[in-house]
């Protein structure tokens, strides 16, 4: 029996790739798309999709769920919309798979409570690329031995949040593995504000936004006479699709919220 999938954010680059992925998947059926703009009745009305993509488009979550009964909502929208989408989906008994970042700790706690009460799976993944998940795991392990760390994340210039969810998640994992410490000279002074990057538990996070980039991150570990660099590059958005498909299948087996793909693989 196919998993019934709805997608929010289908007109974005990631969302469009996800549409093609679900349409081609033999264990999934794309039953609806959520789009706040009235862009057409079906995906076939949009120039970016083939005429055979007759999947209906809805502007309201409630109408979408009532008409198409999806099992899973894949959200690839933006930080302004994702919290409301996730909360509404859970309250309508739809399992969210979220690839959008920008949640506050309070929002994550509330969503986790709802998912637990309803015994529904929910996956919030700052990054769907398997290689990026391995990078985070390796970084956590390295921090046990090399606690002086800086993170440089680089993304396309249309990304709204900084630092990226992947960088924040990496820093949180490193925080679990090392004792908090202040890095750099104790009397260092920024002659340009922000030059040393954002401070997270003593480690510095630097965000780069440039055209031509997709999603890239390096974690630098310094030690006496040595530098260890762990780096991951997503060269195109296909790198995320296997992770999305994996999460759609996995969320059907779950009864609570999981934050981070590294907690599943």
Swiss-Prot record:
Annotated GO biological process: diaminopimelate biosynthetic process; lysine biosynthetic process via diaminopimelate
Classification via PROSITE patterns: DAPB
Main localisation: cytoplasm
Entry annotation: catalytic residues: 155 (proton donor/acceptor), 159 (proton donor)
Entry's EC annotation: 1.17.1.8
Keyword annotations of the record: Amino-acid biosynthesis, Cytoplasm, Diaminopimelate biosynthesis, Lysine biosynthesis, NAD, NADP, Oxidoreductase
Binding-site residues, NAD(+): 9-14, 99-101, 125-128
Lineage top rank: taxon: Bacteria
Catalysed reactions, semicolon-separated: (S)-2,3,4,5-tetrahydrodipicolinate + NAD(+) + H2O = (2S,4S)-4-hydroxy-2,3,4,5-tetrahydrodipicolinate + NADH + H(+); (S)-2,3,4,5-tetrahydrodipicolinate + NADP(+) + H2O = (2S,4S)-4-hydroxy-2,3,4,5-tetrahydrodipicolinate + NADPH + H(+)
Residues that, per the record, bind NADP(+): 37
Top EC group: oxidoreductase
Stored InterPro entries: DapB_C (IPR022663), DapB_N (IPR000846), DapB_N_CS (IPR022664), DHDPR_bac (IPR023940), NAD(P)-bd_dom_sf (IPR036291)
Alphabetized PANTHER family for the sequence: 4-HYDROXY-TETRAHYDRODIPICOLINATE REDUCTASE 1, CHLOROPLASTIC-RELATED, DIHYDRODIPICOLINATE REDUCTASE
Role this protein plays: Catalyzes the conversion of 4-hydroxy-tetrahydrodipicolinate (HTPA) to tetrahydrodipicolinate.
NCBIfam families according to UniProt: dapB
Family in the record: Belongs to the DapB family.
Name of the protein described by the UniProt record: 4-hydroxy-tetrahydrodipicolinate reductase
Source lineage: Bacteria, Bacillati, Bacillota, Bacilli, Bacillales
């Amino acid at each position: 029996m196919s998993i019934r999938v709805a997608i929010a954010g289908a007109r974005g680059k990631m969302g469009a790739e996800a549409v093609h992925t679900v349409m081609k998947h033999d264990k999934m059926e794309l039953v609806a798309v959520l789009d706040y703009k009235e862009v057409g009745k079906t995906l076939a009305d949009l120039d970016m999709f083939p005429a055979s993509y007759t999947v209906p488009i809805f502007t309201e979550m409630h109408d979408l769920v009532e008409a198409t009964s999806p099992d899973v909502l894949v959200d690839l929208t933006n930080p302004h919309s994702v919290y409301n989408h996730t909360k509404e989906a859970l309250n309508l008994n739809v399992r969210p798979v979220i690839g959008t970042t920008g949640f506050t700790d309070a929002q994550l706690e509330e969503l986790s409570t709802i998912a637990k009460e309803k015994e529904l799976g929910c996956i919030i993944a700052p990054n769907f690329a398997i290689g990026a998940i391995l990078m985070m795991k390796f970084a956590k392990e390295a921090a046990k031995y090399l606690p002086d760390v800086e993170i440089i994340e680089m993304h396309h210039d249309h990304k709204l949040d900084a630092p990226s969810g992947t960088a924040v998640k990496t820093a949180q994992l490193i925080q679990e593995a090392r004792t908090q410490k202040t890095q750099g000279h104790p009397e260092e002074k920024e002659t340009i504000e922000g030059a040393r990057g954002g401070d997270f538990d003593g480690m510095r996070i630097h965000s780069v936004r440039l055209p031509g980039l997709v999603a890239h991150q390096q974690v630098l570990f310094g030690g006496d006479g040595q530098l260890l660099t762990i780096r991951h590059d997503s060269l195109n958005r296909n790198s995320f699709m296997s992770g999305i498909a994996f999460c759609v299948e996995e969320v059907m087996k779950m009864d609570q919220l999981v934050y981070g793909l590294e907690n599943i693989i």
